[in-house]
Amino acid sequence: MKKWTIEDSKELYNINGWGTSYFGINDKGDVYVTPCKNNTQIDLREVMDELALRDVTPPVLLRFPDILDNRIEKTWSCFKRAAEEYDYKAENYVVYPIKVNQMQPVVEEIISHGRKFNLGLEAGSKPELHAVIAMQCQSDSIIICNGYKDQSYIELALLAQKMGKQIFIVVEKMNELEIIAHEAKKMNIRPNIGIRIKLASSGSGKWEESGGDASKFGLTSAELLEALDFLDKKGLRDCLRLIHFHIGSQITKIRRIQTALREASQFYIQLHKMGYNVDFVDCGGGLGVDYDGTRSPSSESSVNYSIQEYVNDCIYTFVEAANKNDLPHPNIITESGRSLAAHHSVLVIDVLETASLPEMPEEFEPDENSHQLVKDLYEIWDNLSPRNVLEDWHDAEQIREEALDLFSHGIVDLKTRAEVEAMYWSVCHEIHALAKSLKHIPEELMKIDKLLADKYFCNFSLFQSLSDSWAIDQVFPIMPIQRLDERPTRNATIQDITCDSDGKIANFTTNRHNTHSLPVHALKKNEPYYLGVFLVGAYQEILGDMHNLFGDTNAVHISEKDGSYHIDQIIDGETVEEVLEYVQYNPKKLVRQLEVWVAKSVKQGKISLDEGKEFLSNYRSGLYGYTYLE
């Protein structure tokens, strides 16, 4: 057998496909991160070793702010190239919707590095608006106000505009326009009004229904005319400065984007012809991330275009439409939060233990005392060949079903059932190996791979850290971060530590294909085995829930410095005490209740005084400990 190489691991996990120059494998067989243009490699295994010395245990979220900076620069550079190519005469604005990742250190880094690119922020709720107004210090940076709005939301936005903020209030529903008009008159201010238009075009992928006629937000053509009439009556015609559209997140096909842009450009033209001098077009989100590295439009976890192609289409479509109609080029806004944030975070989890299906030892041979069903399965196993593999599979299935039925009726004993199951799984392993040599694998045999996978139990909560994996079956790149110079000899599904059967991952991307198991290595005694889950910087942190009361994980900020790495900040994960308080427990009261119970148990002689002290000490220290296993 050919010696396994690092190149084999690169191909197996397709790291060159989804890694987009940020991730790779070094000569030691460890995954590295290249956050900066200077190509400094940060070894993830070395990072985890240092964190272990500093008593920071998995699960841990590694954030690389330098990657955020690079994504901002890359997007801005793409706009600059497109503007030069198409002789674009207006301004483009990159806006970060903070709903993608509202964590303060993330937003702060985006604002800090985005300042020189005039990067703006988008708020989709009242709490988000409070954060955005306070953090966005540059008066010329754009703030987009989306989402449902009440009087206090609109009043806050208008007052901020009055004090110099460049705020656009985007109308989602007609009643919002009425509130804007009322509050603006009261404050004696000319509001910057935007209108979200409900396009007929829709996106593609998991969020396809976010756009089109069934979309949740936006005004139809008839409602738009009603809004224009209202603006005229209120003397606010000149205040309509922006149109906004959004056809869905993670759009997989560039053709859907092109269609939507053409439709939106006609709204821009028609409004100008009607005398509304709209000077901003907000193209919304949708710029996707290639999570599986395939660049395939048929995969819901991929995209078939680049950032440059997306930006080119945005600029070209409106330049062409404006030029044909002798209109000024609109200022173009994009809200590409997923593309900005996804790559900068890596979740590292450790494998606690494994479980695999039972198999008969190779030296096993049935004897005269063995049940006939065991003998029949052994005969199938002993005579397996590629020519009869499907028939043998059917026979093995029938024998197992018969054994389970006989056990349920009390006809065969537990020992026989165990032997039948072990022999059955031995047959399955052999059939799976033989099937790989077939030119055309029967569909029935394809499911064996899923059945035979080991279970790798990992120290994390799927619901807290990878919500989209559970909720919408989103595929994230997952791979070991070490031992990649060794051949992976096992295939496994990933199980979390929640008490929920949904807490598992059984959908992976390898070799440019989606599979139901992940190639992994057998565990070594007294050696940690880490798995990295990549591209988790968008939505996953903020969508996480506290199923089984597992809280936020440890988070570590790592930057490149002088050709190496520097740990800038360690943010401790939530403690047991903190998550109990979320669900309205009073930890101090819990301790007091236990003290009474323990004292009573000591008096009754159930435990000694020292045992009581030890129990209370363990309980108190547990309250201040990590919610995950340590």
Model-derived segments and spans:
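Active-site-proximal beta-alpha core segment in soluble small-molecule metabolic enzymes
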Residues: 87-282, 287-289, 293, 304-309, ...
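Short, glycine-/Ser/Thr-/acidic-enriched flexible segments
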Residues: 30, 38, 67, 101-103, ...
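Conserved, well-structured core domains of diverse proteins
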Residues: 1-57, 559, 566, 576-579, ...
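Low-complexity, highly charged intrinsically disordered N-terminal segments
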Residues: 25-102
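Short alpha-helical segments and helix-capping/turn motifs at coil-helix boundaries
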Residues: 7-9, 73-81, 104-109, 129-130, ...
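Flexible, glycine/charged-enriched surface loops at secondary-structure junctions
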Residues: 58, 62, 84-89, 274-278, ...
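Charged (often Lys/Glu-rich) extended helix/loop segments that serve as interaction or gating elements
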Residues: 305, 313, 319-630
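A non-catalytic, amphipathic alpha-helix used as a structural packing/dimerization or gating element
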Residues: 66-74, 226, 263, 313
